[in-house]
């Protein structure tokens, strides 16, 4: 569920402890307990330290306790640097003595098989019984850099953020990635407030620490490495709070290359994998995704250093026509919007630039800056003052220390004391150029991130600017309950699915079910020729593969003959499939084939998939995911982002298609999924989209109902 498991006060006993017990303390070089104890002493932990080792009386000038039973009651946090077999009993003893939090380094739990999972569940039970926060097992520990609390077994570079400095909080399921990210940020002059590696998450997960970081006044951005969210609804609640608090969450989540499940019952199940579902749901909560660790650090830097997040419509100051062309290519590849600027719509720029330099975006000032370096200040200021522009990039040839010395001071001057509510980012175009550190530090001091390459800057800006284009409002309508759903279960064949969905306003062609040839002929006459005949059985997921679809039947005799042929085809395809009968349906005019499907994930909730469909849907995968919170206008915008969207708009003289009707269908299916958790999947494929004003028609329907 979405409820918080721990209060901030409970997490405080882990991340702001007043007392720490080191179980397995040592002075043996390389021992986990030795490094941990040395960290606490070296960085002058302000609270009480209680080393525990049955064979020692003193370590680093501290009294050593021989067993947990000797410890005072109510210690805030205990860190276990002991072998796995001793962990459970030790945790239980600590819980009984009122210890508030435990860090478990030891591996060999859920990742090690059935026995390890059993022990991990026992840890979870102890935590639940005593209200204890357990970090791990199989984790690197945690560090509060602000209050200098290093509860980790690796040597720590304790860089405490100066008072008033914006800092990032790290919540990572990988201890190594948490450490690497902190290491990557420090040379950039960026600070970490607190870092937590959650490991196997026996009793606390990343969502618990995000909740704490949202309320932490020393944290301004939250960076995450996540492999699997075990409590999605709780994380969504935490992400929603972070967005409301103005604290961006930047997440690196591997998994987009995972193969879809081949055994899925419908196209939708095969295509809407967990990664895509997760990303769709979290994007609506304001989460920003990175594709690489470097990109995670780059996005974090802009979010921390700049005075505001990038908006849509980027403007670029450049110094080369050739590089201007490359900028267009990079921007198009990553979906970054470059605002159009010209002499007519940008009078402020026109007044600044010499006659031989046209106003454009990127603005190419050529080598003018070497002789008139104040041009950098003037142009960048004009771009920042333009309300149409959401972010500005100085794309600069750095060359050498002398050239940098001419250019950098005039770029730094733009923000030195300025109050622009949009980011200015420096992007070198000559990665590897020798640039004195003092110039880079000067940029950073006034809030200008420095990137050695244009592409890195563009990608990070694109990820952040995308947030400004998202419709995060909850515009969901009332959930729709399907009458008669209690009478079906498992895979629901087409004819029954249409019987259930048609009364809700889902557009299907006229159709009738028939169990024998004469009934089929009578149905065809009632509907009106020509008709299509389709085999019907719960076990027949892909009718066309089995020869179970015959088109354009025009007479009673053709219908009777088709009935026999379909039964023969299906029997030849798979003798185990027993047909319920056939569906007789009116042949309608053809058009562009789309797919509309939906999935009710037991953890993430409902999501609707839509895009270009037909038998090639799983090959082309030109689809998008939509959530029930989106209204028809937001869905339309999403549909027009599909790769084949020009077809929807009208291509090569063809009419524009009824995207509005398709969007309404998607919204309706989303409301159906929201109102019926037992519907695991719906697949409408194909859905024919007709010219604008003529609507859509779902030609096939399949449902999966599970209770």
UniProtKB/Swiss-Prot annotation:
Keywords: ATP-binding, Ligase, Nucleotide-binding. Catalyzes the activation of ferulate via CoA-thioesterification, a first enzymatic step for conversion of the lignin-derived ferulate into high value chemicals, such as vanillin and bioplastics. Optimum pH is 7.8. The keyword Oxidoreductase does not apply. It holds the Pfam family Succ_CoA_lig. InterPro entries: ATP-grasp, ATP_grasp_subdomain_1, CoA-bd, NAD(P)-bd_dom_sf, Succ_CoA_lig_flav_dom, Succinyl-CoA_synth-like. ATP binds at residues 267, 524-535. The keyword Nucleotide-binding applies. Its EC number is 6.2.1.34. Optimum temperature is 37 degrees Celsius. It catalyses: (E)-ferulate + ATP + CoA = (E)-feruloyl-CoA + ADP + phosphate. It is an enzyme of class 6 (ligase). Catalyzes the formation of feruloyl-CoA, ADP and phosphate from ferulate, CoA and ATP. This is Trans-feruloyl-CoA synthase FCS1. It comes from Unknown prokaryotic organism. The lineage of its organism: Bacteria, environmental samples.
């Amino acid at each position: 569920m979405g409820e918080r498991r721990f209060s901030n006060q409970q997490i405080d006993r882990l991340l702001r402890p007043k007392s720490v017990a080191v179980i397995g303390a040592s002075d043996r070089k390389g021992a986990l307990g030795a490094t941990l104890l040395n960290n606490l002493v070296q960085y002058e932990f302000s609270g009480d330290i209680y080393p525990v080792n049955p064979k020692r009386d003193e370590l680093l000038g501290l009294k050593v306790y021989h067993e947990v039973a000797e410890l005072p009651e109510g210690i805030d946090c205990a860190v276990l640097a002991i072998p796995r077999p001793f962990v459970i009993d030790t945790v239980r003893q600590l819980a009984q003595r009122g210890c508030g939090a435990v860090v478990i380094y030891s591996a060999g739990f859920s990742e090690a098989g059935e026995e390890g999972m059993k022990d991990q569940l026992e840890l979870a039970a102890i935590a639940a019984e005593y209200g204890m926060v357990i970090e791990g097992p199989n984790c690197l520990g945690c560090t509060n850099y602000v209050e200098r609390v290093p509860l980790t077994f690796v040597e720590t570079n304790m860089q405490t953020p100066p008072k008033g400095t914006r800092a990032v909080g790290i919540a990572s399921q990988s201890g190594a990635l948490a450490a690497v990210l902190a290491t990557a940020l420090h040379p950039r002059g960026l600070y970490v407030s607190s870092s937590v590696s959650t490991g196997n998450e026996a009793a606390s997960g990343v969502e618990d620490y995000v909740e704490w970081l949202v309320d932490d006044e020393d944290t301004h951005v939250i960076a995450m490495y996540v492999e699997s969210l075990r409590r999605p609804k709780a994380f969504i609640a935490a992400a929603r709070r972070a967005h409301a608090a103005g604290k961006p969450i930047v997440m690196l989540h591997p998994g987009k290359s995972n193969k879809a499940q081949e055994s899925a019952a419908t196209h939708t199940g095969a295509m809407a994998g967990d990664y895509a579902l997760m990303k769709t749901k979290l994007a609506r909560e304001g989460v920003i995704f990175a594709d690489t660790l470097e990109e995670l650090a780059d996005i974090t830097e802009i979010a921390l250093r700049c005075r505001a997040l990038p908006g849509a419509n980027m403007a670029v100051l450049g110094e080369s026509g050739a590089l201007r062309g490359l900028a267009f290519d990079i921007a198009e590849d990553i979906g970054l919007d470059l605002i159009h600027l010209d002499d007519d719509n940008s009078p402020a720029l026109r007044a600044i630039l010499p006659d031989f330099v046209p106003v454009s975006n990127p603005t190419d000032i050529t080598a003018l800056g070497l002789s008139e370096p104040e041009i950098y200040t003037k142009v960048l200021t004009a771009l920042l003052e333009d309300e149409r522009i959401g972010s500005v990039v100085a794309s600069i040839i750095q060359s050498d220390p002398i050239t940098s010395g001419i250019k950098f001071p005039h770029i730094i001057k733009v923000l030195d004391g300025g109050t622009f509510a949009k980011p200015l980012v420096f992007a070198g175009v000559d990665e590897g150029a020798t640039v004195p550190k003092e110039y880079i530090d000067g940029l950073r001091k006034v809030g200008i991130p420095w990137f050695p390459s244009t592409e890195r800057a563009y990608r990070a800006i694109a990820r952040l600017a995308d947030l400004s284009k998202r419709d995060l409002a909850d515009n969901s309508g009332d959930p729709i309950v399907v009458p008669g759903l209690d009478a079906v279960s498992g895979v629901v064949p087409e004819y029954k699915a249409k019987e259930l969905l048609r009364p809700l306003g889902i557009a299907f062609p006229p159709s009738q079910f028939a169990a024998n040839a004469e009934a089929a002929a009578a149905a065809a006459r009632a509907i009106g020729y020509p008709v299509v005949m389709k085999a019907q059985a719960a076990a027949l997921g892909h009718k066309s593969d089995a020869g179970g679809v015959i088109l354009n039947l025009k007479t009673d005799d053709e219908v009777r003959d088709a009935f026999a042929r379909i039964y023969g085809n299906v029997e030849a395809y798979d003798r185990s499939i027993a047909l319920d009968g056939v569906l007789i349906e009116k042949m309608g005019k053809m058009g562009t084939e789309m797919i509309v499907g939906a999935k009710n994930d037991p953890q993430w909730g409902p999501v609707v998939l839509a895009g270009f469909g037909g038998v090639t849907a799983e090959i082309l995968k030109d689809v998008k995911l939509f959530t029930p919170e989106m209204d028809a206008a937001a869905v339309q915008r999403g549909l027009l982002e599909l790769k084949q969207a020009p077809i929807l708009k009208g291509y090569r003289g063809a009419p524009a298609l009824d995207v509005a009707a398709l969007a309404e269908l998607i919204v309706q299916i989303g409301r159906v999924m929201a109102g019926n958790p037992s519907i695991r999947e719906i697949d409408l494929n194909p859905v024919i989209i007709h010219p604008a004003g003529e609507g859509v028609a779902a030609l096939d329907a399949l449902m999966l109902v599970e209770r």
